Regions:
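Short strand-edge motifs at loop-to-beta-strand transitions and within beta-strands
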Residues: 85-89
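Asparagine-centered strand-capping/turn motif at beta-strand->loop junctions
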Residues: 54-62, 99-103, 114
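Tight coil/turn sites that cap or link beta-strands
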Residues: 33-41, 45-47, 83-84, 94
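Bacterial N-terminal signal peptides
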Residues: 10-20
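C-terminal partner/receptor-binding element of secreted or periplasmic proteins
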Residues: 28, 103-129
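Bacterial N-terminal signal peptides that target proteins for export
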Residues: 1-12
């Protein structure tokens, strides 16, 4: 009977560890030396299950506008990151982060860290409106 009790305890502990590991697998960290060409917007996320946070520094020569866009909604400006300035913006589940280069001539450069639900973040570029 002692063997069965230990086996059952091992199974329960294993199941508990597995159930706590699944949410942890969704959390992650991405570091990026991001470049955004003149007249372009970097689009991050949209449709993901959890939220994420973007932190970092604008180490380029031009300002970058940070916006958030919930699914089916208009983009909402969160602020502008001047050259040498920092960004710390949190985006909710399903929300997209938009980082817009304000220049039509120069490339924007940022050093970013993205934390939170990074497992399914899409990344693409689009032309500025």
């Amino acid at each position: 009977m002692l063997f069965k009790a230990r086996t059952m305890t091992s199974i329960l502990v294993g199941a508990l560890l597995l159930s706590t590991a699944v949410p942890a697998a969704q959390a992650g960290e991405i570091t990026s030396g991001l470049q955004i060409e003149a007249g372009q917007t970097f689009e991050l996320g949209g449709g993901q299950e959890g939220g994420f946070t973007v932190t970092g520094k604008n180490n380029g020569p031009v300002a970058v506008v940070v916006l958030g866009q919930a699914e089916g909604k208009a983009a909402v400006e969160r602020g502008t990151v001047a050259p040498g300035g920092t960004v710390d913006a949190t985006f909710g589940p399903g929300e997209m982060a938009l980082l817009r280069n304000t220049s039509r001539q120069k490339t924007a450069r940022l050093k970013l860290k993205i934390t939170g639900d990074t497992s399914s973040l899409g990344m693409t570029y689009s032309g500025n409106p």
